[in-house]
Amino acid sequence: MSLVAIGINHKTATVDLREKVAFSPDKIHDAMKSLASRTRSGEAVIVSTCNRTELYCNNGDEADIIEWLEEYHGLDHKDVAPCLYNYHGQTAVKHLMRVASGLDSLILGEPQILGQVKQAFAKAKEAGTVALTIDRLFQNTFSVAKKVRTETEIGAAAVSVAFAAVSMAKHIFSSLSTTKVLLIGAGETIELVAKHLKDNGVASMVVANRTLERAQGMCEEFGATAITLAQIPDYLPKADIVISSTASPLPILGKGMVEKALKQRRHQPMLLVDIAVPRDIEPEVADLDDAFLYTVDDLHSIIEQNMASRKEAAEQAELITEEQSYLFMDWVRSLESVDSIREYRNQSMAIKDELVERALNKLAQGGDTEQVLIELANRLTNKLIHAPTQALTAASRQGDLNTLGQLRTALGLDKN
């Protein structure tokens, strides 16, 4: 039994090459079936994201798997080979556990990768490319990733601008279940902010954007309300939290607009987070009572502190993945011993059945019972001791005292 992991990621290859070796969702089902057919066990899982493509196989030949990858995507070996990494056995197990725990991610400890690995495993099960070993490997991996999350602080501290903005909001309001949020912009960063807010159970969201259609498309996903930038003055007084990230060259929220909104709110506090460059919110807003303005620079200082915290947590997480990968390999070895015992018993039973059948035939033909039984005993003894005798002879001739000692112990020769 041999586990193999072969891959390419953001550390080893350019975006251009990563795009070429990626597997589209509509083709990955057939791709896993094709890859599995190149292994002796029929087991394979493909993890393909924007930052990595990795092939996990049981009882597969490394060179054959690499050849399959190159053939599938029509790529030259010289272009792909320098960017590939490969792991075997315990190191392959540990690598998968590190990946699922976010220890190998572009952003250390990011949680999205675990969901992506789970999705890849689910697709492999649908494709029928999962059996005992791969199933146990991935189930153990998910348990390890959960253990890393619960026993370390790897995911507790925000290390992305979007996550940091929402974390700050949670810190100030303690619970977001009763807060109303106004998001300004509809780009990737605001989309991530909306996702984090939804995950944290925010009461309601309004998305303001220059292009209403773009905002509406995003709002459908997150159950938010879409408005234009011109409508912001009408919605601002209702917002407990304002998070803005647009590409506007001029500020969108001025001191006067915010001051008016605060009066309508009867001076209930308002958190404003400006993560745009150049800034979307006039810095003078910070002078207003009840307005708490934070900029992207404030978030970056938080992120830097948190990254240091995550690195400390990562050291603990590495120990967990190391320990758990060895425990998994103990299970693999126990499985191999079970297979060996089963094969040995089946072989012995086959020898016994063959010789008993031969003896019964002789008795049926009128053979002497005593003679037939003696012949059966002799033949059975010779057959069963043939392989051990050869092994003892070979070890003696080679002067391999260690193997000789193990054989003597296994055969019970050293017992008093």
Swiss-Prot record:
Keywords attached to this Swiss-Prot or TrEMBL record, sorted alphabetically, are: NADP, Oxidoreductase, Porphyrin biosynthesis
A GO BP entry is: protoporphyrinogen IX biosynthetic process from glutamate
Pathway, per Swiss-Prot/TrEMBL?
Porphyrin-containing compound metabolism; protoporphyrin-IX biosynthesis; 5-aminolevulinate from L-glutamyl-tRNA(Glu): step 1/2
Which residues does the annotation say bind NADP(+)? G185, A186, G187, E188, T189, I190
What does the record give under GO molecular function? glutamyl-tRNA reductase activity; NADP binding
Does the record carry Secreted as a key word?
Answer: no
User: Out of the domains of life, which is the source?
Assistant: Bacteria
Give a yes or no for keyword Signal in this entry: no
The EC number of this protein is 1.2.1.70
Subunit structure, per the record? Answer: Homodimer.
Q: Which family does it belong to?
A: Belongs to the glutamyl-tRNA reductase family.
Q: What else is known?
A: During catalysis, the active site Cys acts as a nucleophile attacking the alpha-carbonyl group of tRNA-bound glutamate with the formation of a thioester intermediate between enzyme and glutamate, and the concomitant release of tRNA(Glu). The thioester intermediate is finally reduced by direct hydride transfer from NADPH, to form the product GSA.
Name assigned to this protein: Glutamyl-tRNA reductase
Give the source lineage, highest ranks first: Bacteria, Pseudomonadati, Pseudomonadota, Gammaproteobacteria, Alteromonadales
* GN (gene name): hemA
